Amino acid sequence: TKDDWMRLAPRARYWRTLAPGGADGRPSASPGEGRGKRRPEAWPVQCLLCAQGCVIPVGGRGRCRTRMNVAGELRSLVWGRPVTIHVDPIEKKPLYHYLPGAAAFSLATTGCPQSCQFCQNWEISQSSPEDYRVPLVQPAAIAEKARARKAPVIAFTYNEPTVLRNT
């Protein structure tokens, strides 16, 4: 279900809680910690992944729509969920004379922190993760698929690639 999908989204990196005394990437208290204790308040968080620096209230998302504040903890809704995978010639990428003639294993997730007026990939970049139902794909499986297709390059493309970064 949609709730399970969001609940199971991995904890994102590159954020900080805006709770008093909070530290980067960690809520100031763990929800439900200790038996019989009152659940601490959830706080807004600030995403530090890109230059937007989105301040995200509980239940809200950043401008890219790929990160969500779930009970005071930032979650990545796109990690391991590429919506498109293609093998492209490396020359299609904005890389000058890098491995000429090689294949690039290209993948993208939904979402983008930018709203470029003439984006040729707007159907992917301006959509939200729940617009596509895709199974979870582990990074090792992506690398194996690239090897099987004899693609020495993995390219995060079709949208701003920082939205996929979670390590």
Give the ranges of each region predicted by the language model.
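Conserved Radical SAM active-site core
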Residues: 69-167
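N-terminal juxtadomain amphipathic helix
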Residues: 4-24, 36, 43-102
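N-terminal polybasic/positive-inside topogenic patches
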Residues: 32-34
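Intrinsically disordered, low-complexity segments enriched in serine/proline and basic residues
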Residues: 24-30
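Extracytoplasmic thiol/disulfide redox context detector
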Residues: 1
